[in-house]
Amino acid sequence: MKKVLKIILATVLFIFIAIQFYQPALNVDKGQVYTTDFTQVYKMPIEIKAMFQTSCYDCHSNNTNYVWYDYVQPARTLVGTHIKNAKEDLNFNEWGTYSNRKQERLLNSIKEQIETKQMPLSSYTLMHKNAKLNN
């Protein structure tokens, strides 16, 4: 029994180490400022801009502020997939390229999701306490 357990643990450890070599591309834009960015299209107080960037931009922009555990597989792949899907729905850096109709629909969706506490995701605010939105 102990031998089987050792083999299983060694195999799991080997797989864990092996998957660390698979590192998907990071969502980092090197500090580029977009003229189409939500905070450029709508002039807003610095506090509101900071709130949006802290609570929304890690998933819904072209620049994510990664923390140490985001570099460890399988978290890296899970975070990368989540960011890719989030940006397909809404990318604040590309806001100015959206049609007026899409912007209005997204604004209504943002308002509703914040009011119903669907966003930011609880799984995100669990690890990023400063991203919680207060009433």
Where are these regions (language model features)?
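Positively charged n-region of N-terminal signal peptides that target proteins for export
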Residues: 1-7
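Hydrophobic membrane-insertion alpha-helices, especially the h-region
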Residues: 7-23
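Aromatic-capped interface at the extracytoplasmic side
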Residues: 20-32
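Electrostatic cytochrome c docking/interface patches
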Residues: 30-52
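The canonical Cys-X-X-Cys-His
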Residues: 52-64
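Acidic helix-start/capping segments at beta-turn-to-alpha-helix junctions
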Residues: 66-78
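Extracytoplasmic electron-transfer domains, predominantly the class I c-type cytochrome c fold
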Residues: 77-126
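Short, exposed beta-strand-loop hairpins at the edges of beta-sheets
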Residues: 129-134
